[in-house]
Amino acid sequence: QYCTIFDKEMIWYSIDAFRKAKTIDDFIVVVDANEMKSGRLNKDYGVTLVQGGSTRNESFKNALDYIHEHFPDCENIIENNAACPMITPELIDEFITLLKDYDYVNTAYKITDALGSYKDRIANREDFYLIQAPDAYRFPLLYKHFDKDSELCHPAHQLPLSATEYRYFDYNDNYKVTYPDDIKIVEMMMTRRKENK
């Protein structure tokens, strides 16, 4: 999340989107122990830092606990991965608005390739979809049910089956930076988005 895209750290794009969103009051950035100790992101961007844990679930729980303690009246939250820098303020606002009618919102993608299964010889791709950040939740419901020791790696999977889900299939230019070459792809996508405005 600290590599550079168009002369800005990748994490800057998420920070900028959250800062410009109209439907949220505040946001936090979860970082590892070394980044927390240095406080660099706070100095550079003026953001509130929360120290993460040894696992993704521990880090997420630390964030939830911070929100619960410092924002006791929090109704809704949205999380993003800094490795997904294409997020926009408008998307954040749309996800938060959807929480008026749903318990949580997932960024979803249809599977277009063939799908295999370790358990069954045949897997019907129509039964599955991909999930990526961002995702949004009604905070009290998520806080009540989230367990940092769970083997489930996506927060929504810990919610009760009665929780209502909105699958957001319209975030077409989301892209997660995983490998160095992905940066070139994101820069191309950002350029195209700017040209289409």
Mark where each language-model region is.
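Conserved beta-loop-beta/alpha segment of the NTase-like Rossmann-fold superfamily
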Residues: 55-118, 132
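Short pre-catalytic strand/loop immediately N-terminal to key active-site residues, enriched for Gly-Thr
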Residues: 49-51, 125-129
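N-terminal glycine-rich phosphate-binding loop and ensuing alpha1 helix
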Residues: 1-33
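Conserved alpha/beta core of the MobA/IspD/sugar-nucleotide pyrophosphorylase nucleotidyltransferase superfamily
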Residues: 130-197
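Short, charged/polar "capping" segments at the starts of alpha-helices
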Residues: 34-40
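Residues that recognize and position ribonucleotide moieties
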Residues: 3, 85, 121, 135, ...
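Conserved donor nucleotide-binding strand/loop of the catalytic core
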Residues: 44-56
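Hydrophobic C-terminal alpha-helix "anchor/cap" residues
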Residues: 18-19, 67, 159
